């Protein structure tokens, strides 16, 4: 009887150990799937959304999809051609892509048509997966401590190049100049 109890207890102990071993192994697998990947030598640039009221200039007439002909500041239009989107004096966003001008009532959009938000970055999807959390610790404060989200792409974003969205207006433009740099350390975790 005593030997049966001992064998039963020993069997139960083995089962408990196997259970915890498997549980720990599975937990480690899920941690490993979210391990951070880091590398050096990244080129970082910034992009922003210009405001028409901050860029007065001679008026230029353009044709906006589904709206017709409208006039905007030439400096403003030039910035949009570079940056992708801008906020008009009317309060809606004006975008330039596929060789045409477009209106968005919700704001500036990323390449997938989603609202462009703080913390967004444009990446080369061959190197960083879409939706990955990205940290660039070599940027100046406060950017070095931010966690960015890889949600956007851009024509000029190829290889070890990340374009950080810095916000709206002239202050955001100044940040693009401040963060543009070479030889940055980039770490990311894919979701």
Label each residue range with its predicted role.
Residues 25-191:
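Solvent-exposed, well-ordered loop and adjacent helix/strand elements within mature globular domains
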Residues 1-13:
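N-terminal Sec-pathway targeting helices
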Residues 14-23:
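Hydrophobic alpha-helical membrane-insertion segments, chiefly the h-region
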Residues 1-4, 22, 33:
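Short, intrinsically disordered low-complexity segments
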